[in-house]
Amino acid sequence: MKKLLLFIFLIPAMLCSAQIDKDQLALAINKADEANTEQLKSFIWKRKADVYVENVLKLTTITEFSFNQAGELETKIIDSESSEKKKGGIRGMVQENAAEDKMDYVGKALDLSLAYTYMTKGQLIDFFGKAAVTEKDGIIEATAENVYVEGDKLTVRVEAATNLFLSKKFSSLLGKDPVDGEVKYEKFSSGVNHGSTTLLNMPAQKMRIDAINQDYSQRVQ
C-alpha cells in the first residue's frame, strides 16, 4: 500500500519532468535562428510570386531581397508582369487603377507572410510561451493563437537536432479578409537554412499566391 501511495505521489513529478521547458526551447530556437540569419545576411536573392485569381494567372512579380548594414531585411520590386491585355481610353484608366489596387493588396499579403517568416526574439518567446508544444520523431511542433492579431493562428515545425525551422503555417487577417499561408524552408549544402516557398490563399478575393525564393548569390566581399 505504501509503495502504491508513493507511486501516486510521484506521478505529477514524473509528468512535470517530461514536459518541455518552453522558455528554454524558445531561447534555443532563437539562438539557432539568429546564428543562421547572420549567415543569410551575406546573400542576395529574388522572390518570384505568381498571383492567381479564380485559378487564372493574373500577375507575376519579382522582388529582390537583401540585408542592409543595420541588419534589416530590405525588399525591392524589380519587375512585374500582368497577363491581362491593356485596354484604351477610360476603360484603360479603370483597368490601370484596378491593377494598382491589386498590386497593393498582393504586396500587403506578401508582407504579412514575411511577418510570420522572420520573427524577433521577443515574438518567438511570446509565441512559445502561449503555444502547445510536442516533439515526435525528431520534429518539434508548436501551435498558438492570437500571435499578432486576435484570432490568428500559427503552427511551426522545427528540426530538433538543429533547432532550425522546417515550416510555418498560419491563418490571419488582411484587413477583414482571411488569409491562410504556409512557408517552407530548405538548407543549402553549407547548412544555411532559408525560406524556399510561400503559399497564400485569400478566399475573399478568390486569390492565391505561389511564391518561390530563387537566385541566391553571396555578396562579393
Task: Map each language-model feature to its residues.
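Flexible, processing/modification-adjacent segments and terminal tails
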Residues: 20-21, 81-152, 172-174
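Solvent-exposed N-terminal domain segments of exported/luminal and surface proteins
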Residues: 36-86
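Extracytoplasmic
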Residues: 40-42, 60, 128, 137, ...
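Short, exposed beta-strand/loop patches in secreted or surface proteins that constitute
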Residues: 64-66, 126-135, 156, 185-187
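Gly/Pro-enriched, hydrophobic low-complexity segments
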Residues: 137-221
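Hydrophobic h-region of N-terminal signal peptides that target proteins for export
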Residues: 9-17
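Positively charged n-region of N-terminal signal peptides that target proteins for export
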Residues: 1-4
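N-terminal leader/targeting segments and the immediate start of mature chains
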Residues: 16-46
